[in-house]
Amino acid sequence: SMGLRQTFGLFFQAFEEGLGCTRTEFGLAIGIQMIFWGMFSPLFGLVADRFGGNKAVFIGFLIFGAGIFMLYSGPNTGIYFQISLGVLIGIALGATAISVPVSEVSKHFPNEKRTIASGLVTAAASVGYFIAPLFTKYSLGEFGWEETLKYFLYFILFGSIVSLFIFAPKKLIDKNQPIVKDQTFFEALKEAFTHKGYLLLNAGFFVCGFQITLIATHIPGYMQERGMGGWSATIILALIGLFNIIGTLGMGYLGTKYRKKSLLCILYALRAVSIAIFIFSPPSNIMSIVFGISFGLLWLSTVPPTNGIVAQIFGTKYLSSLFGIVFLSHQVGAFIGAYLGGYFYDQFGSYDYAFYMAIALSIFATIVHYPINAVSYTHLRAH
């Protein structure tokens, strides 16, 4: 699921030639996808919390297949392009990508091991990040965009079968269980939105969404703008996927040793450095490789500590739902990153302004994570 989502930026030239869409229209479709992904993450999270993650994820894959089918078979221009690539695939990702799978797996582990567990799930997504861009670039050249999208349906079929085996633990492994066992979802929601740390976490994850979607969507166009070949962007995306495996696993381990908010501060600061070096250096294959590796290590490394902080504060009973809301904030940032990248290019002929924003937002995220208090509600109520 995450691997396929990573490839859509590689389709832009084909969509431009075959469907006549502009960069702004393409960016808008990806932005809509991000918003619907975000809106449906807490909804599918609630389905997972109440009825099981397998049901939520399976439904998501069915919708994913419908979106891909409509995208290659038609109608797929104008508003229908926005519906297929934007709305349907966005809804599907709300169930199949990151928030629900990570949270469902996290429920099986105690707090001290939870970041490792979520890191493993995120690393699995990174395998898709590595393989999917390479496969897509090859398939687009050999078979064309319609056939490539048809091949995507086989991956979706595999994912839907695997999703049937996602089961919740028979008993929650949660120190907050005595407090949350009779708590309703709306009570948990009220607690979350009155917790300063939860609100700051939402603000920080907004930045993550802006950055990774800007890069995933517009790095092919950005590399073309800088006079680099199409394979440069593919290599960047593939390296991001490969080194994200190392980054998420490493962050999962570090989350058991150090304060999660401190790790997030460091991550966002390093993102600012990585982006700045990349855009202010002369374009070259070496810099493409350096950026792919460096940003890959930081790509989804934010997920284990972010998910871990939510679970640490509020417990795991409504983890899929509460983390889904944090992920909605992520997707609002993703919408803005996807849309502004295309908008700035069409208006000013350059992606530079969008990347300047990405650097500034990294500094903002570094600052807002520092005051987060990750003390659980068990402790707060006891005092």
Give residue spans per PLM region.
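C-terminal ends and interior cores of transmembrane alpha-helices
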Residues: 63-76, 271-282
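Intracellular juxtamembrane helix-capping segments at the cytosolic ends
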Residues: 95-109, 301-314
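Helix-to-loop junctions at the C-terminal end of transmembrane segments
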Residues: 41-52, 249-259
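Helix-loop-helix hairpin linking two adjacent transmembrane segments in secondary transporters
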Residues: 124-168
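Hydrophobic core of transmembrane alpha-helices in multi-pass small-molecule transporters
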Residues: 80-95, 287-301
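C-terminal transmembrane helical hairpin of 12-TM major facilitator-type secondary transporters
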Residues: 261-309
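Conserved small/polar residues in nucleotide/adenosyl-binding loops
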Residues: 378-383
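Extracytoplasmic gate region of multi-pass secondary transporters
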Residues: 8-9, 197-238
